[in-house]
Amino acid sequence: NKILFSTTKVTGATTLVGPFVGLVASATAFSAEPTFKEFNTLKAKVLATGVDGDNLCWVMTKAQKAIAEATPKDAGSGIMVCENDHIAGLPVFTTNYIGENNIGLGDWRYQPMGLFGDMSFVIDPYSQARKDAVDFVLNVNYGTTTLRKEAFALAKVTPASK
């Protein structure tokens, strides 16, 4: 999850990069309480590139989703920007890996991932026996790549002044 949704390159044992890393510098500015129009404008920006949008999904933190659930879609209707885990007809996926004040949008058919080669699963009851713990280690070769960069967009929410 961290590789797919982070806006910074994950370091360590991988060279994989998710779709939002290259979008940080060109992120669309959203207000502290993003409006329905702001969400729809970002959606239109992705759809205008020719992406059909059948697999579009919003990515944000639970805190950002809570703000959208409390933001009215328009004055007086009582309808909120995020209702039933959807914004502008698209599902909302929450993860802290996207980072606070970031909202991602992507058509995930253009971010394939797979496991390659042999998979080894090691059960190690000895290394941490003094701690009464058993280590479970799964070793796999994992890969992912962004097929169409235009299928993804990133918005940066302006933090509310205190």
Indicate where each model-derived feature is located.
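Alpha-helical scaffold segments that mediate packing/assembly in large oligomeric complexes
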Residues: 1-45, 156-162
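Charged, gly/pro-rich, cysteine-poor intrinsically disordered low-complexity regions
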Residues: 29, 33-106
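Sequence/fold signature of self-assembling virion shell proteins
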Residues: 72-162
